[in-house]
UniProtKB/Swiss-Prot annotation:
InterPro entries: Brix, IMP4/RPF1. It comes from Caenorhabditis elegans. GO terms for cellular component: Mpp10 complex; nucleolus; small-subunit processome. Residues 78-259 form the Brix domain. It comes from the Eukaryota. GO terms for biological process: rRNA processing. GO terms for molecular function: rRNA primary transcript binding; snoRNA binding. This is Brix domain-containing protein ZK795.3. Disulfide bonds: none annotated.
Length: 292
């Protein structure tokens, strides 16, 4: 079983490396095509191979199966496994139970004394699509790991300002409808990447669903909100918070699963201690940048 997983992983990495080379070649062809159509100078680095690149520039682009790990995500509903760090507090257990109701088709398992490798292998054996692990500090949930199976990526988030359903008065019972998703102000390339990771944790909702989950970005903090709405007789819409609510701060994406993190490549890492870290936003593009 372990040798089979290692072989599949090596094949996946090999196919991805081949597609990266092909993707780089198509980008060069696109530059040549644009230069010829607009009658502009060809990039100095491409002039030597311009004739060869121009020969294949008339062919259409390719779709990359390996480059997008979520290409077939809409073909079937996601199957989520939710667990916690070792020796969880009662508050973290309660939070994991609430988050299990957030994700349709989710299954919560007790961590026990199993290590990460055993948890990932058990999730793969059940044909799960994603593994979510919640961590804590002194009884307060403070971290979320989202690992897409079977080959990654793995996204890391820190959590803050967690308010559970038990702390929200008169929140009522939680709806089990598939929720509609709202992603606000995640318009950069990295923002689209995190949108892809988060939205494929949920199945496709029905049009008449009254449940809404919002991921709203402000200064690289993603606010998670869960609401249910109903239409009154006079046509007004009443919005009720169902909880829980919290803030997510993404800080890393690894191109691998949790048991192979030591050998996995970094797709993106937040560098908090650089001189320009406070001035930059990674998940959104300002309107001034759009105007330029």
């Amino acid at each position: 079983m372990i040798r089979r997983e290692n072989r599949l992983r090596r094949e996946f990495i090999f196919r991805k490396s081949l597609e990266e080379k092909q993707k780089s070649l198509e980008e060069k062809r696109e530059k040549i095509r644009n230069a010829l159509e607009n009658n502009t100078k060809i990039d100095y680095n491409l002039r030597k191979d311009a004739i060869e690149l121009a020969k294949g520039s008339d062919w259409g682009g390719q779709q990359y199966e390996t480059d997008s790990e979520y290409r077939w995500a809409g073909a079937q509903d996601p199957k989520i496994v939710i667990t916690t760090s070792r020796d969880p507090s009662s508050r973290l257990k309660m939070f994991a139970k609430e988050m299990k109701l957030i994700f349709p088709n989710a299954q919560r398992i007790n961590r026990g004394h199993y290590d990460v490798k055993q948890v990932v292998q058990a999730s793969k054996a059940q044909d799960s699509t994603d593994l979510i692990i919640f961590t804590e500090t002194r009884g307060n949930p403070d971290g979320m790991l989202v690992c897409h199976l079977p080959f990654g990526p793995t996204a890391f988030f820190s959590m803050a300002n967690v308010v559970m359903r038990h702390d929200i008065p008169n929140c009522g019972t939680m709806s089990e409808q598939y929720p509609h998703l709202i992603f606000d102000n995640l318009n950069s390339k990295l923002g689209h990447r995190f949108t892809t990771i988060l939205k494929h944790l949920f199945p496709v909702p029905k049009p008449d669903s009254k449940r809404i989950i919002t991921f709203s970005n402000s200064e690289d903090y993603i606010s998670f909100r869960h609401h249910v709405y109903k239409t009154e007789n006079d046509g007004e819409v009443e919005l009720t918070e169902a909880g829980p609510r919290f803030e997510l701060k993404p800080y890393q994406i690894k191109l691998g699963t949790l048991e192979t993190l030591a050998a996995a490549e970094d797709e993106w890492v937040l560098r908090s201690y650089t001189n320009t870290a406070r001035k930059r936003t990674f998940l959104s593009i300002s309107r001034a940048d759009d105007d330029e």
